Each structure stands twice: as C-alpha cells, then as structure tokens.
Amino acid sequence: MFPFSGRGLGCLRLCLLRVWAGEATGRWACGTCQSRLYGSGGSQPEVSRSDPARGTLKEWALLSQKLHVQTIGGKVICLGTIYGNIDIHASDKSTVTVDKLQGSSVNISTEDGLLKVKYLYTESSFLSSAAGDITLGSVHGNITLRSKMGNITVDSSSGCLNALAQQGAIDVYVSQLGKVELKVHKGSILVKVASSLQAYLQLSGKEIDVNSDVHVEEMNEAHRDDGVIITGFLNQTSEHEKWIKADAPKGTIRFRSQSWFQSLKLQD
C-alpha cells in the first residue's frame, strides 16, 4: 500500500504513484487502482485494489506531483479529476477514458485503444495513439496530438494545437487561438472556428471547401497539379502571430464557422 494523507476535498494526495495493470487474465504487479475519500475534515481515503478479472483501473480524484500509470490489455478510467504531472501508457487494446486532467505536463499514449479526455487544462500535453481514436472535449494550453491509423477529434481548442494523423480524419473546433497546425497524410480535415476569430489562414489540400459564412480577407487561391492552396486573413486581421494551417495532400479540407453553443455536446 502506498503512503497517503487524507484531505477534505475528495482527493488522494500522493507524491508519486506508479500503477501497472496486466491483462484481465494476467498477473497484476501493483493494485492501488481506485481512490475515494469519504467524509470531510481530513478523513482517510479508502484505497481498494482493482478487480483482476475485469482488468480495469479506476481513479476517482488524485492530487499528485507525478502520476504514472501503465496497463497492458486493461482499461484506465478516471471518474473525476487528476491534478499534477501525468504519464499514462496503455498497451495492446487498452483504453484510456478521463473526465478531467489538470497539470503542467501530460503524456498519454495508447496502441489500439480509444484515448478520450473530456477536459484538459495543461501547460504542455502530448497525446498519441498508434491505431486508436483520440477524442478530446475542451482543451486548453499547448497540445500536441499524434495518430498513425486513427481519427482525431477536438470539440473545443483554446491555445496552441498541433495535430498530425498518418491515416484518418481530423475534426477540430477552434474557440480561442494561439497557433493551430493540422496535417493528415491520408484523410480529410474539418476545421470549425468561432465566428469572431481572427487569424492568418493557410489551407493546402487536394480539395478545399471554405463555407460562405467564413469571412476571409485578401484570399489568394493557387492551383497546382496535385491540389489547391488558399491563404488569407480571418475577420480583417493582418497579424501572422496567430494562425491556422491545415494540410491534407490526399484529402479534402472543409472550413466552417461555428458558434460556441453549437460546439457544445449536450450528452454524456
């Protein structure tokens, strides 16, 4: 059992937590997998071991300097909030599903399983998957996404976003802008932006579809043998410090305007 101290905020405070989870039929090296705090005023949290038959890691709320989780063939599920520097690696068909992550550094990877985070507040994040989809809700900060054979979806991005997919689709809504760079080698890109967003725009793809409700100033369209390049400025800005660049050499880029309310997904 790892040392811990109870807090009245529904969190388990740890300086360093390492968890390894084997397959559902495999051996578990360490089983500190579920944490909940009952009562208030410094009452002790109850830490229970995961059920090896299910192969699932569940975290309710953690406040830590560093959290390291590694699983092979199981599931990592966070039902609440994780605070701190986070490092999660899920091998085989393992999935990672998290309600909220908040910290200075977040590193999450999966191989053939879904990577899903509802809220992400971080200074720097790197999320990757070999063959699973990456599905994010509201993200803030400097976010880097990598996928080899999966789709990337971001419901709302506020800050700097760099997303690269080898084969798949990218679907992103940009609410507030820093620098956004999207690229897919084999697939298409859908970019939705807030109607008032100001940015330099550069789109490059086999086909490009810019909706008429998007106001692009000084738009320049250049055709080439293998596609089209469109550049311009959104909403009468001439700054190059904030920009959106999208590249789909073998696919279609669709650019749309979308309200903040439309970006909300009113479902679980």
Could you tell me what each predicted segment is?
Residues 1-268:
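Intrinsically disordered, low-complexity terminal regions
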